[in-house]
Structures are given as C-alpha cells and as structure tokens.
Amino acid sequence: MARGSVSDEEMMELREAFAKVDTDGNGYISFNELNDLFKAACLPLPGYRVREITENLMATGDLDQDGRISFDEFIKIFHGLKSTDVAKTFRKAINKKEGICAIGGTSEQSSVGTQHSYSEEEKYAFVNWINKALENDPDCRHVIPMNPNTNDLFNAVGDGIVLCKMINLSVPDTIDERTINKKKLTPFTIQENLNLALNSASAIGCHVVNIGAEDLKEGKPYLVLGLLWQVIKIGLFADIELSRNEALIALLREGESLEDLMKLSPEELLLRWANYHLENAGCNKIGNFSTDIKDSKAYYHLLEQVAPKGDEEGVPAVVIDMSGLREKDDIQRAECMLQQAERLGCRQFVTATDVVRGNPKLNLAFIANLFNRYPALHKPENQDIDWGALEGETREERTFRNWMNSLGVNPRVNHLYSDLSDALVIFQLYEKIKVPVDWNRVNKPPYPKLGGNMKKLENCNYAVELGKNQAKFSLVGIGGQDLNEGNRTLTLALIWQLMRRYTLNILEEIGGGQKVNDDIIVNWVNETLREAKKSSSISSFKDPKISTSLPVLDLIDAIQPGSINYDLLKTENLNDDEKLNNAKYAISMARKIGARVYALPEDLVEVNPKMVMTVFACLMGKGMKRV
C-alpha cells in the first residue's frame, strides 16, 4: 500500500504509533522492541501468546526480510491486519503502553471510537520547560507557572499567547510581538492569536496540517503536545549545525570529509558529540538515547567531561560528584545523576524514571539542552579545513526546507541538498501537488553499501522524468545526476516549481478549478485594493513599491477591514530599518488573518519576486474564501 493512499490524519496517527514502538528512535522496529511493547502495555496475555503475536507481526511486516520493520512496512501491517485479532492486540498494546493516557477521539476528523493517546511524561517535561522559559514574561502571568501534574497546560495554550511566545523563543523574530492580541481577549481575538501561532509554526517547519485553531482552543492533549514538541525541538536543535557552530568540526573522524559531517542530522551530531566526550573519558560508546543510557553511567561521565573546569574567565569550576555511580538501584542512580545535572542548570526534560525507562524523546531533549549549555568543544586550529564550505543556508533555502517539513515529509529535511539526494522527499512533494507517483519504481532505504548511490540516482532520474512528463515543469538541462549531487541552482529550480504549483493548486481549489497565473493574481490584488479605496497598487511581483510592504498591508486591511494599525507604520521616505519594521508587521499580520505565508520579511524588503508571489497568492486565497 503506497503512502499516497493513507490520509494525512491517519499518517500522523501511524507516525505516533510507530514512534511509540521504535523506542531507540532509529527508524525501524526490531523483534525486541515489539516484545518490549507488549510487556510495557501490561496486557493479560500469556508469554507464548506474546511470542506468537510478535513472530506473526515480524513475518507479516518485514517484507524485505532484513530482520526489522520500516515505517512503510508498518503502514502495510496496519492496513493488512485491520480486522484480525493480532491487529487488535497490537493496537491495544500501543494505546496502553505505560505512561500513555488514552482518550476517546473527539475531533470531527477522527472516526468514532478511535483513541488518541498522550504521554504524561511529555506533559510534565514540557510544562517545566515552558514555566522556566516564560517565567519573566509579563504577557504570560495569567497562566505561568503551570502545574505539571494537572491539565493546566491544555488550558493555557487556549488563547494562543504561550504558543506565540514559544515559537519566538525557538526561532527569534518569527512573530512580530505587535501582532499578538494580549489584553481583553474575545473569541475573535483568540482565534486570531491561534491563526498566528499555527501559521507561524508552519513557517518554521512544524507539521500542522491536521491541527486547527479549534483543537488548540479545546486543548486536545495529543495535538497540543505534538505541536509543542515540534516547536521545542526546533529551538533545541537550532545551533546543532556546523555553519552556526564551527566548534562541531572537532567531531570530525579520521578519513572523514567536512561534507560527510555536514550531512549528519542534529540527532546524529548529538550522538557523535556524546561519544566524543565518552571516548575522552575512556568509556564505552552509546548507540542511542534510550536503551544505552538507562543505567545513567554514560550520563555521569558526560556531565563530568562537559562541566566547567574553571579555566574560563568568569565561569567557576563545577566538580561533578561521581559517588552516585555506586548506587545499586537504577532509579536512585538516575536521581543522583540528575542532581549533578541540576548543579549545571541542566535538570530539564527527564525524571529519574524517564532515564531508566529510556524515553527516547525526552532523553534526546535532555542531551540537546546539555549540549547547548556546555558543548565543551574547541574549534580545531591546525586542521586543513576549507572554512568557506561552511556557509549556512540562504533564506530562500531555509524557506523551501521549512515548507517541505511543514507538509510532513518523511524523513525530515535538515540539509536541503544532501537530504534530497535520493529524491524520496521530492516524490512525496509530487503527491502533494497531485502528480501520481508509481512507488513500485522507487528504491527505498536502507540502500546497500555497494551500488547504493546508483539506487538513489535511479530515483532522481525518475523524479526528473515525472517533473517533465507529468507535472509539465520546465526542467531544461536538469538531469537526475544534478539532484543526486546536490547542484544548488538546478535543485532549487525544481523545488521552486513544486512550491509554486502547490500554492497555485490551493488557489485553483478555492476558485472552483479556474486556472491561475501571475497576471490573474496581480489583477485580483489591484481590484481588491481599488474596491477598498486603498491608494496602493502593484504592476508586478517586481514592483519596487513592494519594498515598503504597504501594498501587502493595504491588501490585508482590505481583506479584513480594520485589522491593520497604521499608527505602527512608516509610510513615506522609508530607510531600510523602517522597511524591515513594516515587513515584519506585514508577514505576521498575513498569518494572523489566516494566510499560511512561508516568506520572510526580508523577501518583501528586497522584493524577491518568487516569494512575493507566494505572499500575494496566499492572501488571494484568504480573500477568496471570505467572499
């Protein structure tokens, strides 16, 4: 069964279920993980029955016979076994897994009788993190501090303010604070805040396709926690990237190129970082942040390695007390370790029980926070390194990457070019723009060591073929090899056409199938401005007047009269700072009235015609819905 035949809602549920079983987070389910699942679920089943079910699932699911179940195989299990006893037991086990609260489906989209589950541990961890992050924010005094042992969190997110603040903490300046409604809130102004939060979350790469403002207002636990985890994770991972943290080059291994290191995901870099310090401590390496850290020993040695040694001015030494290592009881040992983490100000995300149970999500967050506070890495001085290769991604590249991630592509795109080199993400994007993909022609990971790149190249050739023949894109001079090798210009040419088609498709759906092009959008913008008696207009998406953002702001006010506070704007003789100030307000206001805008304020100031087109197209979509 191809992924394309699974709804977005169901896909999200399947991903959640998969993550619960895949405790080591390596992207595959092993025989042992299936066994552990049934044990953790405390189902009244005899041991031989658990063994039978596990063997049955492995036999049915492991289609390529590699001894593990991939996500695609997992989807097939769920569809192939829908009505069998094995399937029912499997689902029951997933829903009953310890620490998971199951609640009946209440969303209109969810079928009657489904169960959405959420983790008490996650709620506890996120509440403590948010309390600390927002403790001094006067706009959050009405809800902070929240009690982690109650449902405070699910009520607190209901007005959108906490979500907006957390998004800005993860990616500063995403939301213009002037656009958040803070005082005397009404159902309408709350709805605006939630629009602003959801559309801004989407713009930083959160997958929010199945989450509506109503879900957040009602505080639906599994949706609230899912969104918060994405926002928190983006913030935690922001600096775990070579171009933003050159000291990470210290993690280069012998015979490895800078390019190899740059391809690693934040999770892989964190594991590499932890093992770098464990190696220096003369300890065994770890292979994950779940089963391998359950005894707290790796954490103890990691804390000892990264704790300040007193050799930096103004940073006093912290000597980690290692005596807790001798504790016989795992929980007690974990508690002693966390007391040492607290001395570094890093007791966040995990309890002693989370460590001992090997909760992969919360342990990953704990490690990421420790890295951000105490990386304890030094940029190599003498190594022959091409520092020029370390340039960060451009704004346009970041926008494209965030757009893809917001659509829920799997795997997540961390590095635009290397993560597209097998075209799997591109095929998913084709499906989003209604270009059918023959998944039987697609090679899927894991790729063999010998000939693996040939498999990826075959995918890329098929991706270009689909673009030319099915999507009717202009791909002159672009071959599969260009995608496979990460040719920037040619890869961007394809991605832009995918994003443009996606944007126009939405407009065409709203307009009852009527074809849309640039001229139609420009004419609609000018007509709408004229009808609202606004003085601004645009001649094209390259019009220099767009650099003031006034045509965008006037259009927003035309679509939702009275929404723009013109007192906050500079309208004549603008310098660059004033233009940027207007643009920040414009982008946030567009999101606030319900337009899912991915562009950045700088795109308006610099009049980047591609991104300008997407802004006006999204606003046109919003305006047409209003009619």
From Swiss-Prot:
Q: Where is this region: Actin-binding 1?
A: 106-379
- Positions with a binding annotation for Ca(2+) 2: 62, 64, 66, 68, 73
Write out the entry's keywords from A to Z.
Acetylation, Actin-binding, Calcium, Cell junction, Cell membrane, Cell projection, Chromosomal rearrangement, Cytoplasm, Cytoskeleton, Disease variant, Membrane, Metal-binding, Phosphoprotein, Repeat
Q: Which residues carry this modification: N6-acetyllysine?
A: 76, 88, 294, 297, 361, 472, 542, 579
Localization of this protein: Cytoplasm, Cytoskeleton; Cell junction; Cell projection; Cell projection, Ruffle membrane
Q: Which Pfam families match?
A: CH, EF-hand_7
- Answer yes or no on keyword Membrane: yes
Q: Where is this region: Actin-binding 2?
A: 380-624
| Expression sites (tissue/organ) | Detected in intestinal microvilli, hair cell stereocilia, and fibroblast filopodia, in spleen and other lymph node-containing organs. Expressed in peripheral blood T-lymphocytes, neutrophils, monocytes, B-lymphocytes, and myeloid cells.
Give the Phosphothreonine positions (modified residues).
Answer: 291, 353
Ranges where the EF-hand domain occurs: 9-44, 49-84
Q: How does it sit in the membrane?
A: Peripheral membrane protein
Q: Which CDD domains match?
A: CH_PLS2_rpt2, CH_PLS2_rpt4, CH_PLS_rpt1, EFh
Residues bound to Ca(2+) 1 are 22, 24, 26, 28, 33
User: Known PROSITE patterns for this protein?
Assistant: ACTININ_1, ACTININ_2, CH, EF_HAND_1, EF_HAND_2
* Gene Ontology biological-process entries: actin crosslink formation; actin filament bundle assembly; actin filament network formation; animal organ regeneration; cell migration; cortical actin cytoskeleton organization; extracellular matrix disassembly; positive regulation of podosome assembly
Q: How is it modified after translation?
A: Phosphorylated on a serine residue in response to costimulation through TCR/CD3 and CD2 or CD28. Serine phosphorylation promotes association with the actin cytoskeleton and targeting to peripheral cell projections.
Record GO cellular component, one term: focal adhesion
Please describe the quaternary structure of this protein.
Monomer. Interacts with AIF1. Interacts with actin.
Q: Which disease is it linked to?
A: Chromosomal aberrations involving LCP1 is a cause of B-cell non-Hodgkin lymphomas (B-cell NHL). Translocation t(3;13)(q27;q14), with BCL6.
Q: What is this protein called?
A: Plastin-2
Task: State the species of origin.
Answer: Homo sapiens (Human)
